[in-house]
Amino acid sequence: MSSEVSSDNPIYGPFFGVMGAASAIIFSALGAAYGTAKSGTGIAAMSVMRPELIMKSIIPVVMAGIIAIYGLVVAVLIAGALEEPSKYSLYRGFIHLGAGLAVGFSGLAAGFAIGIVGDAGVRGTAQQPRLFVGMILILIFAEVLGLYGLIVAIYLYTK
């Protein structure tokens, strides 16, 4: 340990960066898992009566998976910037924590929205095919919630 550990660069500074990286991947993966599970059960229920629509109905599952990629990107960026405490300020630790929480919680919210919309949309599309376009539009708006978190996280990361 270097003697450069100070009040600006405390020994626990990198802890906040690690928590930011962990928050980014954990919360966005939770959102992606919920979105995948919820829309996947809708696909399974729908495919009993309309098996020809399975591939068309896989879109919500793919969109939920993309949410986890947002968290992965931010987690890797933060993990790559971690350094020993003498070179890692408390300010950077807090910024990285904020970036991880921003993408993580927005990914969690987006995953919930994608799962609920995907489940109802897939089941509705099986009964009325004209609902497909509406489902896709609503899914795009839900996906953008996660993208907003990614943008804020990258902006914070570059500070």
Swiss-Prot record:
The record marks 143 as: Essential for proton translocation. The chain crosses the membrane at residues 13-35, 58-78, 97-118, 131-156. Residues 1-12, 79-96, 157-159 are lumenal. Disruption phenotype: RNAi-mediated knockdown specifically in pHCl-2 expressing enterocytes delays pupariation. Knockdown in the intestinal copper cell region decreases intestinal acidity. It is found in: Membrane. Expressed in the larval middle mid-gut; predominantly in the copper cell region with lower levels of expression in the interstitial cells. It holds the Pfam family ATP-synt_C. One of its GO terms (cellular component) is vacuolar proton-transporting V-type ATPase, V0 domain. It is a multi-pass membrane protein. Residues 36-57, 119-130 are cytoplasmic. One of its GO terms (molecular function) is proton-transporting ATPase activity, rotational mechanism. One of its GO terms (biological process) is vacuolar acidification. Keywords: Hydrogen ion transport, Ion transport, Membrane, Transmembrane, Transmembrane helix, Transport. V-ATPase is a heteromultimeric enzyme made up of two complexes: the ATP-hydrolytic V1 complex and the proton translocation V0 complex. The V1 complex consists of three catalytic AB heterodimers that form a heterohexamer, three peripheral stalks each consisting of EG heterodimers, one central rotor including subunits D and F, and the regulatory subunits C and H. The proton translocation complex V0 consists of the proton transport subunit a, a ring of proteolipid subunits c9c'', rotary subunit d, subunits e and f, and the accessory subunits VhaAC45 and ATP6AP2. Belongs to the V-ATPase proteolipid subunit family. Proton-conducting pore forming subunit of the V0 complex of vacuolar(H+)-ATPase (V-ATPase), a multisubunit enzyme composed of a peripheral complex (V1) that hydrolyzes ATP and a membrane integral complex (V0) that translocates protons. V-ATPase is responsible for acidifying and maintaining the pH of intracellular compartments and in some cell types, is targeted to the plasma membrane, where it is responsible for acidifying the extracellular environment. This is V-type proton ATPase 16 kDa proteolipid subunit c. The gene is Vha16-1.
